[in-house]
Amino acid sequence: MDGELTSGVAARPAVRKLGPGPLVLLAAALLISACGLVYELVAGALASYLVGDTLTRFSTVIGTYLFAMGIGAWLARFVRGDALSRFVEIEIAVGVVGGFSAMLLFAAFAAGVLFQPLLYVLVLAVGILIGIEIPLLMRLLRGDFEFDDLVSRVLSLDYLGALLASLIFPLWLVPQLGLVRTGLAFGLLNIVVAFATLWIFRARLRAPGLWLAAAVSFAALAAGFALAERFSRNAEERLYRGEVVFATQTPYQRVSLMQRGNTVRLYLNGRLQFSSKDEYRYHEALVHPAMSALAQPRRILVLGGGDGLAVREILRHPSVESVTVVDIDAQVTDLFRGQPRLAALNAGSLSDRRVTVVNADAWRWLEARPTSDAPFDAVFMDLPDPSNFGLGRLYSPPFYRLLARHLTADGFLVTQATSPVAAREAFWCIVTTMEAAGFGTAPYHAVVPSFGDWGFVIASRSPYRAPSRLPDGLAFLTPEVLRTLFIFSPDTARLAVEANHLDTQQLVTYYDQGWRRERN
């Protein structure tokens, strides 16, 4: 009976145990994909940090990379000679080009030399080389697997490598290593794959030249990794024209503190946040027009403002009982609370007993805060400019409406609103968006030499009236000066623009277009 049941069933082929050679090549498929994607994420992140326009940078970098991989896959048909030697040669080339790409791009931007052409040349080079490698791997493994099995194994490992890279890049690599060292670390990983291939196939590959090339490349990448922090500081000093006194990559941003003479400047992701020589103009203009218009402001919320400079101005008002600062980056608030010179700049505001610092995402914190808690008399949004979708969402009607639930009926919401000169459309887009959320608005602007003409908006549910009195000891604002801040010249006057909505993020487009126009 058993013979009758099994006679029509084809016998399954025996599972052959894989040797070290095929296992190394399969592992290479995973690592090649991970390395390639990391190189492109590094390039896209660095370009968005330095040039802005995050959506366009990442879209064009990833699109160019995938296109280049297609070119490489087509070119693989023309690769002649020993496929194993060619694979090792290409792996070394990928490690060197990809590993040093962030360093080259940073240096090019700091020197003002052909940054964007170099960006896409490097992306094309890495994509073409990796596009060649995958067909070569299949060629090398075709004797160990049936075709269907080979394709599924190689491609599944390739996609798995991409997944792993996309997860560890933002969660561990960039916060721990930074962009330059991340690129160099994965360059070293490519060279390790080359070494492993040379060793496992040493009986077949008698190529001392490849060993030498791999060793020299490994040494160069290791030296670059060891010197990466010094290189980054030197590049930043050249770019920002000052001495780096502190620089770190946090989970959220690149923080660079520069000093030139007696002036200290803070940069986040390459964008100036303040200069100690004139920050008082910005922070006085941000805080006092609203605070002085309130009879007895007691409870204040600051979103962003981890440098404590806006809090310093808020604490000039004796009626203030509590200030809550919600800033996502603990390393920034710790720096401005613990570093003596910076703490002196903000007058120790973050250590004041009335001040509570919360390191959290502003949107999530507000959603979690019970509406039964006492509302705030004023909210100050001292956030970075809306240069990407992550920041642009904090300038949207849903966020403004969320803030309104935590604001007193006669309270004020104040935001910095970029430059009405350089980014005129973006400035008036913020005004329009606040009005779309149900607020009345009072836009104004002030000249801050480090920034230029800078805009602000006061939003409220009752009419705003400029105060006739301000705190004593201000260096910039007087009641007479304050009244002039609400006057706009014809070249900064209101424009008809769209409101910023979460699905379209028109504000980010306006902002990028305005600042690109200003740079040109």
Residue ranges of each PLM-predicted region?
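Alpha-helical transmembrane segments of multi-pass membrane proteins
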Residues: 2-330, 334-342, 347-449, 454-463, ...
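SAM/dcSAM-binding transferase cores
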Residues: 463-520
